[in-house]
């Protein structure tokens, strides 16, 4: 290997002023904190955002916004959701669709009501009536909406911010009454006594969508013995066959039914015990002579738990047990064994289920079947009432379980008490356990339109496809929807009850009248006006007969009516909407409530396509929480934290880039390391754009229209590659696969542009004569790249795209990048043959660059131009591609030495011995030599023939001619 060469003696004179150096006002730094708001102001002033999409002449595209709750600060979940929607809307706008995005807010419900109450002193709460609470809740919600709205706008989200939809607005509440009314008149809404999920902490009924199931819930479970007081005739015959009849009848005080329950507080409400007719049961005697009835398959488990040995006396089918009578465990009454259903299994317990019809849906159904009393033993606070007799006043979530268990123990009925871990429903707002409680509630009878809802699901496109299976199974299995709530902050159920009878007043006349009143005055009048003012004219004379109901509707009924209150009512929108896009939890929430109401009223789904995303997690895949200290605040991402070194201001575009980078169909991570990586990608894209802009500062496309056939091969390939990238990004946007856009963009800017085309172009741009064809053809291509790159990134990097557009140095027909429309590149640019040829040459270039980098690492050379490359081909495809380039390439641009940025490239039959480094791979042998000749002080190429320049400098002939001219 040759020793390190002495560096050329540097001249004091610099040819810098003779070079065509980069010139642009497009800053290398984004300065997002100040620049992004300026761009947003530009959009607003020039009516670029909302009005641009609304004025398009194409068909409507309606992405209907699922309303976030009007409470609390914006978080990363909001960012993921709203940015995804905005990317789609901006893309559709550029494609010419008529896009009018109406953002919305869900304004009613318990969290806001609780916030209002918590802000008041105790005497203020005491004096606050329902109307006063509603006015304070309205004020609170509007403040929250204003704060969230400003945050969304700062993220670059376009929408009808001056006219969003709010579920507290008059027209919305009126439309919701219309949906309720049509469902009632269609026979899908009824009032009935049923066990519902009841939240003692909120004092209201809850729907399934308002529940959550913590992982670490333990209940106090008990095994209880119920003393049999009478045996059925069928069992007596069976006993007689085994000669056991007299033994059991003479020892009834030792004959028991074994039950198991995880809700001991419901035992005072017991009205029966239920068995599965298909299960085999046994009467089994323990070592003390006590005889128990339980499922045969559970003998071993029960024996182990109770620490007793059992001897089976008789084995009977469950269907034979009906009619057996037992003494109630806490009351002076007798009950019977009844037949239950398949919910009774031998997976746990005893195979015999304690049945309290007022406190469980299965129990309720059994109670209805056998005409058992539907007794609710708990009040709205969770306190046991008079029906619980001696336990009245105990609270089911506090002391009731322990004291009832103690009573069972005292009466020798407690067999075992143990902690039992299982799924148990909690109120998602208060984070407290719920109970089943039978109350008079309003229900939507899903059974009445279930088949239509399932058909509607089939008609919708679900992304991902698993979403269809998920919502289908939920609708198949769901019971009737409890839509009434015992709270003040909501839309009232517009019903009047007879004061002295059981009749209700709810018909088309009252519904239409209330709907008109709410549209004019708002729902507050339900609490402000008396019955005479609320009733239609024909009922006013008998207004004293009626009293208005005070239940409000489930907030899921509120948001689930948005298709009627927004999409149907606003001319600029479409119903069904083209797209609903929310988190995957909305299969049981908004997607489902919207589907059920729309199908019940109009027999069709409210959406054509449903797209779901996962949740935002921290970098370690954990749920964000203040207690863990892992919350990522989108506001801090944009504006930076108190310590800007630790929490720099990245701007809205980096936040948006994060959304485009992730596979949002699953849960997605976010954190400081991820943000740093995204910031690097953002910077690379920005620097690429800056390089493009800076090198076309003296270019005007009007003067320089060039035919594709006149371009060098490298430029033709670059335009062909631009078409490929544009097509790939278009497909990614069309399929909502934004992570593919992110990957394509990154590869295009780094691999295709920075590392290849723009790297090669430096000599053409800086060194060539200013107006030479060699330079102008490159500028022509770069102008096409930068214009189309700006459009392609604009749905995601909207601020950067606009910044690029505003810094294009020549005049364009469009004042904004969003007025350009989506790229429709000339078909003449497409040349598949170039792709294959140049792909081969790029592979060779990569290998040669590795060899040159080896020289640089060993400090043998500084720049690649100090080298000469010999290549001995061993790959015919590469050899043919080099021959093709030499034959058809432009002699000023398509020299392979220029593509390598070396002083000379030779295809050889033999290698020289005098080399710096040699590399042998599947493409052939690559030899790196020290370049011969002298270095040109202007272009830094090494040439055999140089001339004297200024102040003893050396110039190659090319540079000498440029300087002279």
Swiss-Prot record:
For binding ATP, which residues are annotated in this chain's numbering? Answer: 626
Q: Does the keyword Cell membrane apply?
A: no
Give the EC number(s) listed in the UniProt record.
6.1.1.5
Q: Please name the top-level EC class of this enzyme.
A: ligase
What GO terms are given for molecular function? Answer: aminoacyl-tRNA deacylase activity; ATP binding; isoleucine-tRNA ligase activity; tRNA binding; zinc ion binding
Motif 'HIGH' region: where? 68-78
Subcellular compartments = Cytoplasm
Q: Please name the HAMAP family in this protein's record.
A: Ile_tRNA_synth_type1
Family membership: Belongs to the class-I aminoacyl-tRNA synthetase family. IleS type 1 subfamily.
Q: Self-association or partners: how does it assemble?
A: Monomer.
Name it.
Isoleucine--tRNA ligase
Give the source species.
Answer: Prochlorococcus marinus (strain MIT 9515)
């Amino acid at each position: 290997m040759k020793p390190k060469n002495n560096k050329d003696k540097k001249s004091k004179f610099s040819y810098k002023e003779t070079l065509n150096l980069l010139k642009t006002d497009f800053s290398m730094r984004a300065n997002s904190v100040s620049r992004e708001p300026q761009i947003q102001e530009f959009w607003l002033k020039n009516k670029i955002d909302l009005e641009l999409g609304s004025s398009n002449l194409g068909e409507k595209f309606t992405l209907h916004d699922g309303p976030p709750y009007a409470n609390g600060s914006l978080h990363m979940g909001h960012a993921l959701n709203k940015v995804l929607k905005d990317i789609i809307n901006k893309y559709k706008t550029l494609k010419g669709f008529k896009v009018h995005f109406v953002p919305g807010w869900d304004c009613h419900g318990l969290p806001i009501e609780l916030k209002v109450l918590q802000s008041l002193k105790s005497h203020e709460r005491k004096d606050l009536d329902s109307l006063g609470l509603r006015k304070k809740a309205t004020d609170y919600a509007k403040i929250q909406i204003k704060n969230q709205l400003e945050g969304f706008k700062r993220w670059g989200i376009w929408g009808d911010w001056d006219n969003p939809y709010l579920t507290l607005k008059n027209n919305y509440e009126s439309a919701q009454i219309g949906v309720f009314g049509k469902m009632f008149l269609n026979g899908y809404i009824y009032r009935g006594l049923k066990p519902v999920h009841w939240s003692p902490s909120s004092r209201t009924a809850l729907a399934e969508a308002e529940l959550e199931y913590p992982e670490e819930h333990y209940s106090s479970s008990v095994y209880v013995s119920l003393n049999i007081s009478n045996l059925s005739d069928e069992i007596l015959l069976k006993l007689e066959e085994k000669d056991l009849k007299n033994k059991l009848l003479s020892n009834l005080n030792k004959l028991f039914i074994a039950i198991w329950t995880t809700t001991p507080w419901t035992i005072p409400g017991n009205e029966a015990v239920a068995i599965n007719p298909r299960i085999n049961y046994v009467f089994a005697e323990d070592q003390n002579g006590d005889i128990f009835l339980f499922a045969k398959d559970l003998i071993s488990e029960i024996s182990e738990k109770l620490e007793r040995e059992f001897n089976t006396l008789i084995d009977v089918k469950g269907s034979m047990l009906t009619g057996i009578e037992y003494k109630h465990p806490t009351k002076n009454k007798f009950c019977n064994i009844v037949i239950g259903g398949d919910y009774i299994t031998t997976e746990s317990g005893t195979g015999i289920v304690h049945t309290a019809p007022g406190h469980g849906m299965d129990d309720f159904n059994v109670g209805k079947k056998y005409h058992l009393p539907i007794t609710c033993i708990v009040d709205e606070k969770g306190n046991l009432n008079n029906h619980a007799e001696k336990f009245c006043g105990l609270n089911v979530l506090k002391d009731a379980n322990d004291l009832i268990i103690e009573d069972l123990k005292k009466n020798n009925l407690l067999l075992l008490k143990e902690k039992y871990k299982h799924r148990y429903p909690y109120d998602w707002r208060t984070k407290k356990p719920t109970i089943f409680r039978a109350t008079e509630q309003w229900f939507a009878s899903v059974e009445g339109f279930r088949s239509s809802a399932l058909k509607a699901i089939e008609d919708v496109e679900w992304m991902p496809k698993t979403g269809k299976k998920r919502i289908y199974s939920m609708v198949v299995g769901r019971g009737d929807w409890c839509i009434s709530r015992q709270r003040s902050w909501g839309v009232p159920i517009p019903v009047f009850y007879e004061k002295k009878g059981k009749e209700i007043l709810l018909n088309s006349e009252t519904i239409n009248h209330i709907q008109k009143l709410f549209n004019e005055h708002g729902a507050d009048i339900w609490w402000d006006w008396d019955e005479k003012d609320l009733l239609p004219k024909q009922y006013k004379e008998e207004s004293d007969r009626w009293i208005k109901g005070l239940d409000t509707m489930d907030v899921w009924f509120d948001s689930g009516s948005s298709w009627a209150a927004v999409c149907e009512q606003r001319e600029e929108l479409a119903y069904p909407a083209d797209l609903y896009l929310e988190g995957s939890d909305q299969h049981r929430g908004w997607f489902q409530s919207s589907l059920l109401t729309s199908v019940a009223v109009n027999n069709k789904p409210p959406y054509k396509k449903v797209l779901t995303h996962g949740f935002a997690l921290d970098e370690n895949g954990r749920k964000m929480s203040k207690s863990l200290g892992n919350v990522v605040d989108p506001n801090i991402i944009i504006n930076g934290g108190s310590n800007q070194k630790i929490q720099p201001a990245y701007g809205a575009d980096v936040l948006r880039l994060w959304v485009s980078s992730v596979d949002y169909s699953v849960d997605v991570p976010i954190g400081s390391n991820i943000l740093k990586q995204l910031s690097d990608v953002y910077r690379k894209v920005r620097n690429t754009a800056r390089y493009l802009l800076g090198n076309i500062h003296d270019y005007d496309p009007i003067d320089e229209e060039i035919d594709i056939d006149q371009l060098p091969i490298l430029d033709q390939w670059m335009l062909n590659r631009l078409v490929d990238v544009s097509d790939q990004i278009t497909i990614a946007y069309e399929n909502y696969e934004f992570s593919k856009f992110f990957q394509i963009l990154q590869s295009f800017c780094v691999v295709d542009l920075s590392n290849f085309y723009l790297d090669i172009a430096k000599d053409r741009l800086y060194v060539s004569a200013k107006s030479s064809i060699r330079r102008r053809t490159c500028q022509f291509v770069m102008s096409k790249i930068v214009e189309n790159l700006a459009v392609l990134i604009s749905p995601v990097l909207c601020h950067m795209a606009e910044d690029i557009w505003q810094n294009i140095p020549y005049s364009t027909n469009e004042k904004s990048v969003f007025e350009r429309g989506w790229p429709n590149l000339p078909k003449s640019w497409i040349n598949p043959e170039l792709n294959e040829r140049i792909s081969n040459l790029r592979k060779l270039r990569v290998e040669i660059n590795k060899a040159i980098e080896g020289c640089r690492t060993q400090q043998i050379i500084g720049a690649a131009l100090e080298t000469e490359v010999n290549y001995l081909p061993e790959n015919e495809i590469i050899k043919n591609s080099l021959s093709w380039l030499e034959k058809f390439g432009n002699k000023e641009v398509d020299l392979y030495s220029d593509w390598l940025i070396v002083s000379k490239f030779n295809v050889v039959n033999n290698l020289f011995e005098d080399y710096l480094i040699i590399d042998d791979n599947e493409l052939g042998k690559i030899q790196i030599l020290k370049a011969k000749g002298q270095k040109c002080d202007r272009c830094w190429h090494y040439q055999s023939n140089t001339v004297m320049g200024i102040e003893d400098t050396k110039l190659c002939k090319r540079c000498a001619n440029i300087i002279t001219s």
